[in-house]
Swiss-Prot record:
Family from the record: Belongs to the argininosuccinate synthase family. Type 1 subfamily.
Location(s), subcellular: Cytoplasm
Database matches in Pfam families: Arginosuc_syn_C, Arginosuc_synth
Organism of origin: Bacillus cytotoxicus (strain DSM 22905 / CIP 110041 / 391-98 / NVH 391-98)
Gene that produces this protein: argG
Protein name: Argininosuccinate synthase
InterPro entries recorded: Arginosuc_syn_C, Arginosuc_syn_N, Arginosuc_synth, Arginosuc_synth_CS, Arginosuc_synth_type_1_subfam, AS_cat/multimer_dom_body, Rossmann-like_a/b/a_fold
Enzyme class, spelled out: ligase
Binding-site list for L-aspartate: T118, N122, D123
């Protein structure tokens, strides 16, 4: 019987390494796919590990710029904070991973793709809905969801099949990381009353160890895209790496969140997003300076829906695409520079400027330079308040009657 091909999203961890052997037993030739999203790991080692475990081919693709320009940038310009706190770290990378799975499957003539998600998380939905949107004819296999093993049973299977056991297997945490941030769950974090231990963090310094003097950074934007840091031009991925280091040193971007998962349960996770939270703060302030009132007031309603769509795995949905088109239109004047103070866990905007600034000092000032037409206020107030005045007059007549 001829073997079928399957492309597996491979991380190098226990689950996806065991999945290679498990898929082979199901008569599949496994092609491993590992993406460099800026997590800082030795991915060449991961690529070779897949081959040593039994994959017939192994890809390692650097997608850092694509991730930042086509995925994280949407989150930045859309101010996507799920439930007001979570900047969508993992949710942003899943549609890109799904896209690459489909591309490699089509390139290799594979009939299926596979991922290492469990049956109780959000990621299984994000992967599979995205894959269905991109190629509805591909079979999707979820080995971890299907085999239903305990951790002990999985380790026993790995030992029986000569699958290398990761040296960090004793770590209680489940971690996912990319340039936009780092998420951490499991272990003691499953108790919402327990304080996260310091070893749950990696990108940020605890407040008591942060510098006692603030650091100032100037972030330059062009049409909503951060392009410079302290006057130096960077690619988006390099800017993120530099700012992650700067903001992380000051303890910025730690988030402890109990969130409502798509699958109906609550989960407690700890996030670190030093650069993301700094950029989100700066970008919002620049929008406040450059967007007209109607757009500035309407945009948050769109942002909430966009956030939910991305969190729920609907990146490739028609509504999400339409919302992004609106988003891009709003960014045409969001150019300028924002000065941010980094200090003791806070990113505080202390200055902003733009050639598209709608702030007119001569209209806003209370000095002798005031150019505002105060006489116009009388007629404006009369017309603006007319509906309320008429309503009051009508109802007072009824009371008197």
């Amino acid at each position: 019987m001829e073997k079928k091909k399957v492309v597996l999203a491979y991380s190098g961890g226990l689950d996806t390494s065991v999945a290679i052997k498990w898929l082979q037993e199901k008569n599949y030739d496994v092609i491993a796919l590992c993406l460099d999203l800026g997590e800082g790991e030795d991915l060449e080692f991961v690529k070779e590990k897949a081959l040593s475990v039994g994959a017939i081919k192994s890809y390692m693709i650097d997608v850092q710029e694509e991730f930042m320009n086509e995925y994280a940038l949407v989150a930045l310009q859309g101010h996507t904070l799920y439930e007001g706190k979570y900047p969508l770290v993992s949710a942003l990378s899943r549609p890109l991973i799904a896209k690459k799975l489909v591309e490699i499957a089509e390139l290799e003539g594979a009939s299926a793709v596979a991922h290492g998600c469990t049956g109780k998380g959000n990621d299984q939905v994000r992967f599979e809905v995205s894959i269905q949107a991109l190629n509805p004819y591909l079979e999707v296999i979820a080995p971890v969801r299907e085999w239903k093993w305990s951790r002990e049973e999985e380790i026993a299977y790995a030992k029986e099949n000569d699958v290398p056991i990761p040296i960090n297997l004793d770590s209680p945490f489940s971690i996912d990381q990319n340039l936009w941030g780092r998420s951490n769950e499991c272990g003691i974090l499953e108790d919402p009353w327990a304080a996260p231990p310091e070893d749950a963090y990696e990108m940020t310094v605890p407040l008591e160890n942060t510098p006692d003097q603030p650091e100032f950074v100037e972030i330059g934007f062009e049409e909503g895209v951060p392009t410079t840091l302290n006057g130096t031009t960077y690619s988006l991925s390099q800017l993120m790496k530099t700012l992650n280091s700067l903001a992380g040193k000051h303890g910025i971007g730690r988030i402890d969140h109990v969130e409502n998962r798509l699958v109906g349960i609550k989960s407690r996770e700890v996030y670190e997003c030093p650069a993301a939270m700094t950029l989100l703060t700066a970008h919002k302030e620049l929008e406040d300076l450059t967007l007209v009132k109607e757009v500035a007031h309407f945009k948050p309603m769109m942002e909430q829906k966009l956030t939910e769509l991305i969190y729920n795995g609907l990146w490739f949905s028609p509504l999400k695409q339409a919302l992004v088109a609106f988003l891009q239109e709003t960014q045409k004047t969001v150019s300028g520079t924002v000065r941010v103070k980094l200090f003791k866990g806070h990113a505080i905007v202390e200055g902003r400027k733009s050639e598209y600034s709608l702030y007119d000092e001569n209209l806003a000032t209370y000095t002798v330079n005031d150019e505002f037409n105060h006489d116009a206020a009388v007629g404006f107030i009369s017309l603006f308040g007319l509906p309320t005045k008429v309503y009051s007059q009508v109802n007072q007549k009824k009371v008197e009657a």
